[in-house]
């Protein structure tokens, strides 16, 4: 890309975001970076200074676009980087407006990279202190300018003329490095107005301008001086309210942003066509960008676009604006300081005069040159003064050079002396080492003292040498450096000597410790020897005493012999008695062991009996649990089958709706194909038309063709919008199908060589996956067809919206007639657009209404099917109730007979309780099923409950015969005209009917409360107990007992089972189960 152009246009595309991918959008832009071209919708081609695809990185964009501006800034020119595009197209990311110090290097945008290169360039110059850099930042929000570097965001005024524009009282902060600049940028971004929209989570609601001022002053090394301004502009994105879904303040902000960008496009168009009047003053953003567009600046126009076809219209508009901006020509000039420029002119004149003076002295000046005497004398005097000053400077330099020579000689002498001192120190160090090695037991203090003496001598010699050369400061500095370098060597040698001395001291200390330990051991041995001598003397005394006593015992030896013989006899007799005693103890022990074995055997027998009983109880409990488990899983299987059936019904309904949508989609595709074909023919016909007609008939035909072309273009546009909406729905269906998971029963694969818990096979999963993949394939194929049709529509729409053709439409029409033709044509196009829009809205409404009707019909069908299933279930439960009642009445009659004969035990009472609970639960299920029966309410879809009074009356008559009048039970006012009147007779009739019903018969034999209803597990246990139950009968009466119908029995007899009188023979414990209220009494 050539960097000589004053305005360059660059286009960059961002990658497709998640929202566009989720909608199923496809790419509508192709990039050719080698030829710097962009093709949109396969029909329109644009060429720019540089093109960056969505795969380009930040560094390549910066190096191509912004880096060449750095040379312009240091040459004294103004520079601008301006980012333009749709909202959410990546302008802020490319510019790096939100970057800070912690941003990753790879993700940094143009602003931090360019500012960093600016400071690095300043530091590489000969005089960095001659540069002064200040930054400022402001935003244009709602056609007002606010300072972003102040917390209160002061509103500022904009002053200027046609050539220049200035923001009054704008804060300018001096910075010295990149960190300071990024800090001010972060402050400005913090106060910038941002908000969330449907297209961007952090959408910029204002235009932000970050300005860097660079000013250089002249110095002795460099006499150039200039000032430059770098403007980095991040414009707010253009947006459509339909896509951003903005409301309230967001909508007002969007309108203001679009208004400012519209004026900016008008300015670009005026500059491109080289109009005399440029509407800069129509908007604030165009006023502050006056230098950047057609003014004194090198400008880079960075257009950011989205590659998705859902944003193709916005992308096409952005590319058209960028293409217009290429035709703008800026006129940049160098911004120089007038004073610095005057100084440079005077210095050039001085050099010229000095050269002329030298030529005159040499006599080679031209003869025709004549000088003014006064001016020449003044110039000569000034030159003489300059020569004197230069001479003085040379003298000073010569004196400094002589001083340096003297110092060098002194340093040389000092170096020789130090070499001698070094030799002396080495000899002394050798003597010290020999002394230490020869005299190992030398006292450490003496060795250290001798080393200190050597070091002292060295320091003394060094001090003497310093005193000799004290008058030369440079020499003293070199001595200090030399002593500092020598000191570590001496310190290392001193450390070695100290280590050797410490080692010798340690050896000597060890020897002393060993000697001390030996002395202590000898002393301990002496004390032990003394104790042994005392002990030996004591033992000798005791031995003498024992000898004396032995002599006395000899005389009594005979008496002791007799006593010993007698003692032996007694001991023998004692041994015999002891043996007899031991035999008796053994017999007792044997008896005790036998008793313990017998007791242990009895305990084991009791334990076995107890265990047997426990096992029997556990067996019964496990059997009941297994039965409950079996019934529970059977219910779960039934529920799963019901859910599967329901799911299949939902899938069928969904498939039907999908088929309807696909049918509509196919119709739309056919219509879109027809419209695209017509539009292509019209485009070809219009392209083949060589020139605009001149006669009236030809002009009328052309206008009709143009209007027809506009109608087809608008129809194609609305068809494309409709196809996009259907593509969005299709993508939702694809996402739903992709997220579907199989729900079915599981069975484990059991093999002899593998763990049964390792692999689990899901029944029907493979069939489900195959079906899902087929559906996905079909939906994706439909999506591809939609994308192709949308691409074709966009291509035709782009061809139809060719601006060049529209501008040349009325070329052959006389100039005075063109406004009238344009006005009439614009009015006709507006009516056509409105008509097409209403037509498509009507079609969409009709389609939605048809879909709602189909949905209503499917729901109605589903409701009817559920009602039919509920009726079947109700009939099944009613039949179960009838069967249960027919069996339970016989058992209850038999049980009542047993109760009258007082032959009832606890088991019978419990079985009766189980029968009662089962009866109540069955009746509750039937009532619940009856309550769930629904009917339509006023023809709507919402089911409403219905009171089944007539049905209850019929059931009462069926169960209890004609003893109950159905009209008394139902209390149906429609059967009695008198009951509809609000009279005393009607009230009395209703009251009498109610009393009759209460007195004569109940609505059901047993009434149970909701709080006493059994759970499903308890119901299963009770059912199992009832099925396995048997009634207790006497052995002499094994036949079935039948109640005698001839015996009178009151219809409302009450049997109180829980409170029946008990006798000691019966021994029936009271029932602990919660009582139920029934017509038979409390149970």
Curated annotation (Swiss-Prot):
SUPFAM superfamilies named among the record's database cross-references: P-loop containing nucleoside triphosphate hydrolases
GO MF term set: ATP binding; ATP hydrolysis activity; microtubule binding; microtubule motor activity
Kinesin motor domain: residues covered: 6-328
Coiled coil: 408-435, 487-650
GO cellular component terms attached to this protein's record: chromosome; condensed nuclear chromosome; cytoplasm; kinesin complex; microtubule; nucleoplasm; spindle
One Pfam family, short name: Kinesin
Compositionally skewed regions (Polar residues) per UniProt: 1044-1055
Annotated residues for binding of ATP: 85-92
Keywords from the UniProt entry: ATP-binding, Cell cycle, Cell division, Chromosome, Coiled coil, Cytoplasm, Cytoskeleton, Meiosis, Mitosis, Nucleotide-binding, Nucleus
Residue ranges of the region described as Disordered: 458-479, 1044-1083
GO BP terms, alphabetized: cell division; meiotic chromosome condensation; meiotic spindle midzone assembly; microtubule-based movement
Phenotype seen when the gene is deleted: RNAi-mediated knockdown results in embryos that undergo early mitotic divisions as in wild-type, but which later then display aberrant patterns of nuclei and arrest before morphogenesis. RNAi-mediated knockdown results in chromosome segregation defects in mitotic embryos whereby chromosomes form a disordered metaphase plate and multiple chromosomes exhibit delays in segregation resulting in the formation of bridges during anaphase. The chromosome bridges stretch, break and sometimes form micronuclei.
Classification via PANTHER family: CHROMOSOME-ASSOCIATED KINESIN KIF4A-RELATED
Cited function: Required for chromosome movement and orientation on spindle poles in mitosis and meiosis. May play a role in early anterior-posterior chromosome movement in mitotic embryos.
Protein name listed in UniProt: Kinesin-like protein klp-19
Phylogenetic placement of the source organism: Eukaryota, Metazoa, Ecdysozoa, Nematoda, Chromadorea
């Amino acid at each position: 890309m050539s960097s000589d152009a004053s305005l360059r246009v660059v286009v960059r595309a961002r990658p497709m975001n998640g929202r566009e991918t989720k909608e199923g959008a496809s790419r509508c832009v192709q990039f050719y970076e080698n030829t710097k071209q962009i093709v949109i919708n396969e029909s329109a081609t644009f060429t720019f200074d540089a093109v960056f695809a969505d795969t380009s990185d930040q560094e390549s964009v910066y190096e191509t676009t912004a880096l060449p501006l750095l040379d312009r800034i240091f040459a004294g020119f103004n520079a601008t980087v301006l980012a333009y595009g749709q909202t959410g197209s990546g302008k802020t990311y490319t510019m790096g407006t939100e970057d800070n110090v912690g941003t990753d290097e790879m993700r940094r945008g143009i602003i931090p990279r360019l500012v960093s290169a600016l400071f690095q360039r300043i530091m590489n110059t000969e005089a960095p202190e001659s540069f002064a850099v200040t930054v400022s930042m402001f935003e244009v929000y709602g056609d007002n300018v606010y300072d972003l570097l102040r917390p209160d965001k002061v509103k500022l005024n904009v002053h200027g003329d046609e050539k220049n524009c200035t923001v009054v009282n704008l804060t300018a902060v001096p910075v010295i490095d990149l960190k300071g600049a990024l800090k001010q940028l972060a402050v400005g971004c913090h106060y910038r107005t941002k908000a969330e929209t449907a297209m961007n989570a952090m959408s910029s609601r204002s235009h932000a301008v970050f300005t860097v001022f660079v000013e250089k002053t002249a110095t002795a090394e460099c006499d150039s001086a200039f000032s430059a301004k770098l403007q980095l502009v991040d414009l707010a994105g253009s947006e459509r309210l339909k896509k951003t879904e903005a409301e309230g303040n967001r909508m007002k902000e969007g309108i203001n942003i679009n208004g400012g960008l519209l004026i900016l496009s008008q300015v670009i168009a005026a500059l491109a066509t080289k109009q005399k009047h440029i509407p800069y003053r129509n908007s604030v953003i165009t006023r502050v960008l006056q230098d950047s567009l057609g003014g004194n600046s090198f400008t880079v126009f960075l257009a950011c676009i989205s590659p998705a076809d859902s944003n193709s219209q916005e992308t096409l508009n952005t590319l058209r604006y960028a293409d217009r901006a290429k035709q703008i020509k800026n006129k940049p000039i160098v911004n120089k300081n007038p004073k610095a420029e005057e100084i440079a002119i005077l210095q050039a004149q001085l050099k010229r005069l000095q050269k002329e003076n030298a030529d005159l002295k040499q006599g080679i000046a031209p003869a025709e040159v004549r000088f003014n005497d006064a001016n020449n004398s003044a110039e000569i005097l000034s030159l003489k003064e300059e020569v004197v000053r230069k001479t003085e400077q040379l003298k000073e330099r010569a004196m400094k050079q002589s001083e340096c020579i003297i110092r060098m000689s002194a340093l040389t002498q000092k170096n020789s002396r130090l070499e001698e001192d070094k030799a002396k120190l080495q000899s002394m160090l050798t003597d010290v080492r020999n002394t230490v090695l020869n005299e190992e037991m030398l006292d450490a203090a003496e060795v250290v003292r001798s080393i200190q003496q050597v070091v002292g001598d060295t320091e003394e010699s060094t001090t003497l040498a310093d005193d000799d050369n004290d008058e030369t400061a440079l020499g003293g500095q070199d001595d200090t450096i030399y002593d500092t370098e020598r000191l570590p060597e001496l310190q290392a040698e001193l450390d070695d000597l100290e280590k050797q001395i410490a080692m010798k001291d340690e050896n000597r200390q060890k020897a002393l410790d060993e000697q001390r330990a030996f002395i202590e051991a000898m002393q301990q041995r002496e004390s032990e020897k003394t104790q042994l001598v005392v002990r030996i003397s004591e033992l000798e005394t005791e031995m003498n005493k024992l000898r004396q006593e032995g002599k006395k015992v000899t005389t009594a030896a005979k008496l002791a012999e007799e006593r010993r013989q007698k003692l032996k006899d007694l001991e023998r007799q004692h041994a015999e008695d002891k043996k007899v005693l031991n035999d008796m103890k053994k017999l007792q022990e044997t008896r005790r062991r036998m008793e313990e074995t017998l007791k242990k055997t009895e305990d084991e027998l009791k334990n076995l009996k107890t265990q047997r009983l426990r096992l029997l109880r556990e067996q019964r409990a496990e059997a009941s649990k297994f039965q409950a488990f079996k019934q529970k899983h059977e219910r779960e299987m039934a529920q799963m089958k019901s859910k599967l059936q329901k799911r299949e019904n939902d899938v069928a309904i969904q498939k039907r709706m999908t088929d309807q949508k696909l049918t509509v989609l196919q119709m739309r595709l056919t219509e879109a194909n027809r419209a695209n074909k017509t539009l292509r023919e019209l485009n070809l016909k219009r392209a083949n038309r060589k020139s605009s007609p001149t006669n009236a008939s030809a002009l009328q035909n052309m206008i009709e063709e143009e209007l027809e072309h506009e109608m087809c273009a608008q129809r194609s546009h609305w068809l494309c919008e409709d196809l996009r909406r259907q593509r969005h729905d299709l993508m939702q269906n694809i996402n739903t199908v992709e997220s579907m998971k199989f729900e079915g029963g599981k069975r484990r694969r059991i093999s002899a060589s593998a763990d049964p818990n390792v692999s689990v096979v899901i029944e029907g999963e493979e069939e489900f996956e195959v079906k899902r993949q087929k559906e996905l394939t079909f939906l994706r194929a439909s999506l591809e067809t939609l994308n192709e049709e949308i691409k074709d529509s966009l291509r035709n729409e782009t061809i139809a919206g060719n601006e060049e053709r529209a501008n040349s439409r009325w070329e052959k029409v006389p100039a005075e007639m063109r406004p009238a033709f344009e006005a009439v044509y614009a009015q006709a196009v507006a009516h056509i657009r409105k008509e097409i829009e209403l037509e498509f809205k009507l079609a969409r409404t009709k389609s939605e209404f048809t879909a709602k009707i189909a949905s209503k019909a499917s729901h109605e069908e589903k409701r009817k099917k559920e009602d039919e299933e509920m009726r079947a279930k109700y009939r099944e439960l009613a039949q179960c109730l009838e069967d249960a009642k027919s069996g339970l009445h016989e058992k209850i009659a038999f049980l009542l007979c047993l109760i009258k004969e007082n032959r009832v035990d606890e088991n019978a009472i419990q079985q009766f309780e189980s029968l009662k609970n089962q009866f109540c639960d069955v009746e509750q299920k039937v009532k619940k099923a009856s309550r769930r029966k629904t009917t339509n309410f006023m023809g709507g879809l919402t089911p409403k409950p219905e009171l089944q009074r007539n049905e209850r009356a019929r059931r009462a008559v069926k169960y209890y015969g004609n003893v109950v009048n159905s009209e008394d039970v139902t209390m149906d006012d429609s059967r009695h005209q008198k009951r509809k009147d609000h009279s005393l007779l009607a009230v009395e009739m209703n009251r009498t009917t109610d009393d009759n019903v209460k007195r004569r018969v109940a609505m059901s034999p047993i009434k149970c409360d909701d709080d006493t209803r059994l759970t499903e597990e308890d119901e299963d246990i009770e059912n199992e107990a009832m099925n396995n139950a048997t009634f207790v009968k006497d052995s002499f009466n094994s036949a079935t007992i039948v109640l005698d119908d001839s015996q009178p029995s009151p219809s409302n007899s009450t049997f109180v089972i829980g409170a029946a009188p008990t006798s000691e023979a019966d021994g029936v414990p009271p029932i602990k189960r919660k009582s139920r209220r029934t017509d038979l009494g409390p149970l």
